[in-house]
């Protein structure tokens, strides 16, 4: 049994996001709902991203991960919110967690928004679907792999797979294999329950100030 440590290639993922956003904006334009993309929408979307990560955590929890082993954080200098799993979880469990936000506040809410003509909900759902690019790259990579255990260690843009098979023979979408070795050598940092980078704190404060100005000035 060996561990295989992967790091997300953020340049490739960001490029994919841009590619997905182009048809998204074309769709929004022809649907005639771009008028809803105002300041209030982006404030709501900011909190929608929190919900995205919360759903990842619910997926972990329903797959048997203890509440104390689910870590949340923000590292906006890398352009991400994240949810990390500090327990080893099987292939089925990580796939469930990856797909929770895509289906529940992406596909499902998109059709709900169309049925009730709630175009704010439609926009939030479309933006969330595009924001699932990293999750979907992991999903389509993982379904091709033989059985493994998944665990997060100390990098919000990376993860570790532990398997009896040689996973180095498999290419993962937008993921680089940076190391491998004996699972007993793995060391995990003692993360707090919630981790927020200094840049993210500053960003949150700016958002809060803008929100106060919008509502009270």
Predicted regions mapped to residue ranges:
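Active-site recognition of the HExxH zinc-binding catalytic motif
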Residues: 48-61, 101
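Short pre-active-site segment immediately N-terminal to the catalytic Zn-binding motif
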Residues: 33-49, 90, 94
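Short membrane-interface loop/juxtamembrane segments of multi-pass integral membrane proteins
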Residues: 75-93, 167-168, 173-189
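Juxtamembrane/start-of-transmembrane alpha-helix segments at the extracytoplasmic/lumenal side
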Residues: 188-202
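Catalytic Zn2+-binding segment of zinc metalloproteases
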Residues: 56-69, 145
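A glycine-rich, hydrophobic loop/mini-helix early in the fold
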Residues: 36, 40, 44, 66-79
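Juxtamembrane boundary at the C-terminal end of a transmembrane helix
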Residues: 209-217
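Metalloprotease/metallohydrolase-associated module, dominated by Zn2+-dependent proteases
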Residues: 1-31, 76-164
